[in-house]
Amino acid sequence: MNFSKRIVLSALAGTVLATPAFAQDQSGETAADDNVIIVTAQRRAQDVQDIPLAVTAVSPVQLERQGVVSVTQIGQVSASFSSSNAQTAGGTNVLRIRGVGTTSNNIGFESAVGIFIDGAYQSRPGVALSEFVDVERLEVLRGPQGTLFGRNTSAGALNITTKRPDLNEFGGFVNATYGNYDNIGIQGAVNVPLIQDTLAARLTGAYRKRDGFVRVINETGEIGRTNELDQFLVRGQLGYESDGGVKVRLIFDYSEVNGNCCAPVEVLKSGLETGGVFAASGLGATGGQLVPAATTPNDTAGLNAALDGLTASQSLVQTSNLDQWGITGEIEFPLSDSADLIYIGSYRDFNSGNTGDSDFTTLDLFHVGNFDGGNRDIGTNIKTMTHELRVQGEAFDGKLDWLIGAYYSDEDIDSSGFSQLGTQWDQFVGALLQGSAGPAPIALFSGGLNPAGSNATNRFTQNSKSWSIFTHNTLEIVDGLKATIGLRYSDESKDGAFQQLNSNPGACGGIVNNVAGGPLAAGQPRIPGALVPTLLITGCFPFVAPADLAASAVLPLPRTFNGNFSDEELIYTGKLAYEFADPITIYGSFTHGYKSGGFNLDSTAAIGGADPRFASEEVDAYEIGLKAKFLDNAVTLNVAAFIEEFSNFQVLEFTGAQFQTFNVPKAESTGVEIESTIRPSENLTFNMALTYTDAKYPNDCATAADALRVQNLCGAALTNAPKYVAIGGATYRGDIGDSMRFFLNGQIRMESDRRTSTQPSTPPTTAAALGNTPLLPFDVQDGNIKINLRAGIGDIDDAWGIEAWVTNLTNEITRGVTFSTTLRGGSRSAFPQEPRMYGLTLRGKF
């Protein structure tokens, strides 16, 4: 379905639409303080309508209404936010704001959208995958936020605040959910005052288990499911407040996210399959892909049938396991009646691991994980420590709101992975060469060596240290006119290394000897020149090839590395805001933001002598906005227009055989955002949000001196950046007699077409081919509409409630990532997004 501007605007004009109430709703569904929404987007508690910043604030009620239980689902409540996921739960989540994010399957890449939970930075999206429960507020801060939030917020930030312990009242809640795919969820919290008005404890927990929605099959039938949930979280807090105003909050949490995640669905068949090459090579008619799919790039019916079938062909079911624990401490110490000292410190230990089939077929070709039973520590560990100290307050009778602070973080990454070739690898390479070199070309050209069992255990380490000093100050120059100046000096240093713990080279040595012109065994032929590239990359497959062979100096083979990256940057912002009527404010701002560079932590990073480092990303952002309320605060309207210009934009792409990192000299995002809430009565609320975003690589994004893969991006839209997104819905609530109440809620989310791959077309091999290479098939996800509905009934005091709900009512199957299937000659595969979900939720409060 293709959407144009006219279609989106017509739909908005013709239908009363609404997004979630952007934190308008409070406990018990009643508005408070004339709909004042308090946020901490500027590190102070402020009315969201008073700050010169584009921010969407979402209440816990609205998160529940739209079924948002993790950061990956925030796009359901924010039109400017999106996320996508690929093969693993912990390492391939990509978050985007205004179409900008860091596409990555690499632990060395850091997100362009920073995540902060209770003021503490979460270093990777995978670290923040635990369930949303007992949340006080979610803030989506749009645009670069580096002045106050620091590192890696070049696209924006998520500021998540959990509920604090209540020093006075005992209470809590319990929620229980059951839905399709055997979706079982339990959430709860209990608050216990230990010393009245002084000390309290709060314990929060959540458990969720759901079957996967993608079937995994081989020749024997279904062998499992992926895209499942199996997770739990426990969080304990202590809150303290002295008579003198000293406040202390200590938070400990532990969580696990397990299950099978995630399997791609083949959407376009390889020409080797449709041409009968796999069959002729003894690999079966389909070459290990058992599910019908499109046979040509124009076969949209085949594409849709493949996606709707939600079935993947694999020899193993992908598994992912995450566990982490962390501690956060916050101290607020009053220095005077107008100044406070605030400290936030955190420590987090995160572990993840995954095993699975990386060729995405039922053939025995290529796997990752500890399959050999060896005593190797396989997986990723990230230890992160952060400290932030701020002094802030007011001066000149409240005319000046000032803040100064310092920040330090220390992070250690230790990531090891085991990869191995399977028994059918050589036969598969023979099919890739369409029989021109016989049924087992690697054995032929390596002197009889079998590549089956070739494996390597690769280890990547990185230590990152960052420190900064910052200030953020707002001065009311005259009544209604405020100026804000923010500065942050940031210093980053990283030590990154790749070492190979173990390697079984298999046939690689024989292939290298052949290519390098070494002596041949009796009957061993020399590799023809035309076949050298294919035989080298398949005989020495980069993920299993031995590192630092003598031939690595001249051939594209893995090399270990041990290096240093350092950078410093001055981040700054300037804003002017004018309140020309009590509820109406206009503002303009400029912000210079920054995201640190670092290391491509991958075995292919230094192939051919390449520099494994990538440069820091910078952004200059311009924004003007309007924040207004009308009709006795019954109508809220917020509008923002923005231009964001990126330099050294960080990109990672998978070529089908290796991961490549590079910086694109230019990228940009421009657009307009509109959010509005209308309350015609106490019982009825309408909200709407519309985002227009033109996020792209400009036509002059690179020069002739840049690599062809960089030049090829010029003129293309950024990945997963639809031009139009509209979210809307309505909520009606009413009483049933004197003891019960009910509500009805509906939401619709529409988006226009979006690209789902890094490259828009087949990467050119020569400069002359730029602009003439064919578009990659099925790169574009068509525009779509998704509808959520929820209805509930319960006690008027919220003592109990029952709700029925459905998300993605029409079962619209979309895809977040589309890629060229590993070494499969033109095949394309995609990771499908969540289908229709429905169920019942019971709520109790005490």
What annotation goes with each model-predicted range?
Residues S27-G28, K399, G405, D479, ...:
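Gram-negative outer-membrane beta-barrel transporters
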Residues N159, N168-E169, N175-T177, A189, ...:
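Periplasmic-side early beta-strands and strand-to-turn transitions of outer-membrane beta-barrels
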Residues I748-A767, I793-F846:
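C-terminal beta-signal and adjacent terminal beta-strands/loops
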Residues E330-P334, D340-S346, N351-S358, E579-D602, ...:
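Membrane-embedded beta-barrel scaffold of Gram-negative outer-membrane proteins
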Residues D33-L167, I624:
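Acidic, small-polar-rich N-terminal luminal/periplasmic segments of exported/outer-membrane proteins
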Residues G239-E241, G405-S409, F460-E644:
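Structural signature of Gram-negative outer-membrane beta-barrels, strongest in the C-terminal barrel
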Residues E110-A112, R124, V133-R142, T147-V234, ...:
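Outer-membrane beta-barrel translocator/receptor signature
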Residues M1-Q66, T72-Q76, V234, G245, ...:
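N-terminal Sec signal peptide and the immediately downstream disordered periplasmic leader
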